[in-house]
Amino acid sequence: QQCGRQASGRLCGNRLCCSQWGYCGSTASYCGAGCQSQCRS
């Protein structure tokens, strides 16, 4: 895991979203339901 509660609350670089599973990305599967940080509003 790269971010979120699975990685001690770490944020993703490049303003990427953190998925519910703790990985960084910019697609809907990262930024949509369950997104932990830097999500699209």
UniProtKB/Swiss-Prot annotation:
Residues annotated with Pyrrolidone carboxylic acid modification: 1
Q: What are the GO BP annotations of this UniProt entry?
A: defense response to bacterium; defense response to fungus; killing of cells of another organism
Give me the disulphide-bonded residues. Answer: 3-18, 12-24, 17-31, 35-39
Q: Residue ranges of the Chitin-binding type-1 domain?
A: 1-41
SMART domains per UniProt: ChtBD1
Additional note from the record: Its antimicrobial activity is strongly inhibited by divalent cations.
Q: What is this protein called?
A: Antimicrobial protein PN-AMP1
Species of origin reads Ipomoea nil (Japanese morning glory)
